């Protein structure tokens, strides 16, 4: 937070001749007592192509600064035309009004300045050598460009101005390590499950041929003529459906026999027929 705040700047003599001094009325506010003075400085930008033509018009020290709102008048001399390129004497340029505390700049205000001839004849037919007495300036006071900078004041230390490093990244590293351990545990569990599946698949492969053999034997063998290696009949290997079919056939044969016997008992013999006659 800035201890000194710029509240306003008023350009007093505007427009004015090129050779007239610059006059400003500056208002600022001081929130706390200051140990050092404030340095105000006005700079004229002589060329847009090089900093070598910049001129420091004036600088003053203001202090001691009481707490509250303060106002003062800043007057600076006009720039020297000999230090400005002839092609840029009559043109648009910039002036910079800045303030520093303890050698550190904390605010800068820039204004555009339009330099032109005061006579219409000179504007239409500009001479080779610029007559400075006929050049006037007009500061665009309604459109200033303000830039502020953070500095260390009396009640602030370097440690307070630059906050200490936080320990949050270390906690994040610990959380990342815990996540890595959890991922490793999950991978181990997946490997164990994969090994168990491999074992189960191996056992299934061993028993599979036996099942295939049992399925093939009933098709090639019957209960009456095929014997296994131990001499046992393979009729037992037949399915329950075949046993039921055999039982049904046996019952049909018995029924046929019974019906034949009944018919034989009812029909008379040839001898009996002759006796009735």
UniProtKB/Swiss-Prot annotation:
Q: Does the keyword Cell cycle apply?
A: no
Q: Which GO terms describe its cellular component?
A: chromatin; nucleus
Segment Disordered: which positions?
154-277
Q: Which InterPro entries has this protein been placed in? A: ASF1-like, ASF1-like_sf, Hist_deposition_Asf1
Write out the biased-composition intervals (Basic and acidic residues): 219-230
- Biased composition (Acidic residues) is annotated at 155-207, 239-265
One GO biological process term: nucleosome disassembly
Q: Which subcellular locations apply to this protein?
A: Nucleus
UniProt-listed Pfam families: ASF1_hist_chap
Q: Which GO terms describe its molecular function?
A: histone binding
Transcription in keyword set = yes
UniProt keyword annotations, A-Z: Chaperone, Chromatin regulator, Nucleus, Transcription, Transcription regulation
PANTHER family per the UniProt record, alphabetical: ANTI-SILENCING PROTEIN 1, HISTONE CHAPERONE ASF1
Question: What is known about its subunit structure?
Answer: Interacts with histone H3 and histone H4.
Q: Which family does it belong to?
A: Belongs to the ASF1 family.
What does this chain do? Histone chaperone that facilitates histone deposition and histone exchange and removal during nucleosome assembly and disassembly.
Q: What name goes with this protein?
A: Histone chaperone ASF1
Q: Which organism is it from?
A: Kluyveromyces lactis (strain ATCC 8585 / CBS 2359 / DSM 70799 / NBRC 1267 / NRRL Y-1140 / WM37) (Yeast)
